[in-house]
């Protein structure tokens, strides 16, 4: 395992678009090439960070050397569940045996909301596919934004607007539960927080839900 020296990817400050902030974000990425050249991939759990590696660094790393760095990051960076599903397909692992939905204590009916950045970079389908393959009954949202929009909804002056935008998502949850309750699953910190605070419900990350289904090994 190759871990970055920095604890933060600076995705929030890169969004500020000042030279100092952009340089800070670029410096963070320099840890990755040695890891990638050593045959490793970059596995991420936050969609906004994945979007930086697959899209944003093309703009930020403008020179020829920077473009090579961007291409390596783009081609070797994956959402955690996307990476897991690709590995399972390549090795023939059976999702229904490895992650049997019947093992989940809250039932097999899920409502899954994917992060907007997942949709942008194309990593969203893998989670839904894996969950269905495991035996879950998955209802999905089709809203573009949960209303949180990164750090937007955390700001006091935008809270009411954030909640108003989120009503479409909350309504879709209610409609999906017309036949009975569903376990809420969301990718990304902001979407997770919006659903949890807006509906006053427990919300699972996909990786968290899948981890709970693994058999407990006796050590």
Predicted regions and their residues:
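Iron-sulfur cluster-binding electron-transfer modules in prokaryotic oxidoreductases
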Residues: 1-219
